[in-house]
Each structure stands twice: as C-alpha cells, then as structure tokens.
C-alpha cells in the first residue's frame, strides 16, 4: 500500500516470525519473511502503547476479535478485522458501538476480501451497468478444506469458536449477495452434518426481490 509502513507485528507464538509463511488455504513463501525494522511483540497492550500504530490488521481466531478490536478502537487505532466479524450479533453490536465512540476518528472495517478481487469488482460493474441486461438468477459455489493456519491447534474445528462452515466459509457468498444485489428480503438454509455433528455442507436460497440467488 502506497505510503504505508509496517511498524510492528504481534503474536504469542514468536516462531511465526522466523518460520516460512506457507500454510493455511492460501499459498505463501517457502522462506521466512523479512519484516525489516518492524518491532516484534508478544503482548498486544504493549504493542498499542509503544508502537502507536494508526491501523492494525487483526488476523486472530474469531473469539478474540471482540476484545482486541474494542481495545484497539478505544486506543484510537483503526482496525481491519478478519472475517467473520464475531460469533453473534450481540458481539458485533459491541464492536460497532466501540467504533462509533472511538477517539481520533478511528474506524472499523471487516475484511471481506472478495469485494476487492478484480474479478468480483468487474462482476459488480457488469451487474450495476446492466450491460447484459437484468440478472435473472445467480449461483455461488465454494469448496475448501479446513485451513491449517496454526499447526497443533484445532480451534477452527470447534464450531463454537469458529462458526464452522456457515459462518467462516459461506459468509463469503453471503457478503457477495449483499454486495451485488443488496440485503435479501428472506434467507432459507439447509445443511448436512457428519457423524460428529459438524456441518459439512450448507445451501442457501436468498430472496432479493428480483433474481433467484443460491
């Protein structure tokens, strides 16, 4: 990003900063990243107080989004928070209230990345311009193995912590429906579960008052 500078990084697991960055469901480098002169922390409060960042990118497990987002906003630091925003609507409301009250004009943005991918930006232009006419139907499909962001941990497999397939993965499609067609008038979902009760598949019909969207 032009004009931006990474001033600090923070992680309880300091090995994250010396190990190769490949992993998860997005390919990365096979060698350790050079973070230049960025300060390295293992304490979030210390980072806020000493590094005094203007903006932080919060890429932590979902249960940590609420407390650390609120803490940063209260310190006047803007937050780009990984999706999903939180596990419940009540928790989201807490984050929004903190953003409205934040000093220094600090802002909160949830990182729904697809809105900024070139192919989706182009799709949005086509829908809005009606270059090929009105959309009469739309279908989105998404397949993914569970990400392995942190080896040796299983928080993602615990739906009470991650939200599972519906909240962590399907949320991409829900966001794109809102982005392209606006807030649905009604939503109907069906799901399939494995023998342990974990959701493996979800299908949703969105009534947007126009095209049929699944």
Place the predicted regions along the sequence by residue.
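N-terminal glycine-/serine-/threonine-rich beta1-alpha1-beta2 phosphate-ribose binding loop
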Residues: 1-75, 93, 101
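Short glycine-enriched loops at secondary-structure junctions
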Residues: 62, 85-86, 141-145
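A short hydrophobic/small-residue beta-strand
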Residues: 79-80
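Rossmann-fold NAD(P)-binding glycine/threonine-rich loop
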Residues: 85-107
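Predominantly a Rossmann-like dinucleotide-binding segment in NAD(P)-dependent oxidoreductases
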Residues: 105-106, 114-190, 195
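A short, glycine/Asx- and small/polar-enriched loop/turn
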Residues: 197-202
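Active-site beta-strand termini and strand-to-loop segments that position acidic
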Residues: 204-211
């Amino acid at each position: 990003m032009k004009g931006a500078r990474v001033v600090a990084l923070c992680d309880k697991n300091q090995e994250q900063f010396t190990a190769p960055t490949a992993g998860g469901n997005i390919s990365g480098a096979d060698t350790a990243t050079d973070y230049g002169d960025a300060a390295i922390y293992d304490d979030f409060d210390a980072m806020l107080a000493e590094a005094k960042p203007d903006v932080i990118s919060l890429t932590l497990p979902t249960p940590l989004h609420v407390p650390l987002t609120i803490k940063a906003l209260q310190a006047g630091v803007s937050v780009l928070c990984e999706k999903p925003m939180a596990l419940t609507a009540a928790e989201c409301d807490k984050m929004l209230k903190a953003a409205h009250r934040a000093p220094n004009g600090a802002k909160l943005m949830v990182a729904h990345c697809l809105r900024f991918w070139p192919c989706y930006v182009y799709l949005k232009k086509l829908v809005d311009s009606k270059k090929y006419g009105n959309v009469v139907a739309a279908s989105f499909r998404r397949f993914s193995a569970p990400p392995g962001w942190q080896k040796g941990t299983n928080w993602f497999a615990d739906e009470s912590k991650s939200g599972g397939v519906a909240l962590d993965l399907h949320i991409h499609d829900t966001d794109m429906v809102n982005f392209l067609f606006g807030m649905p008038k009604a939503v109907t979902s069906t799901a399939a579960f494995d023998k342990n009760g974990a959701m493996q598949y979800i299908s949703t019909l969105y009534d947007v008052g126009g095209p049929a969207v699944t």
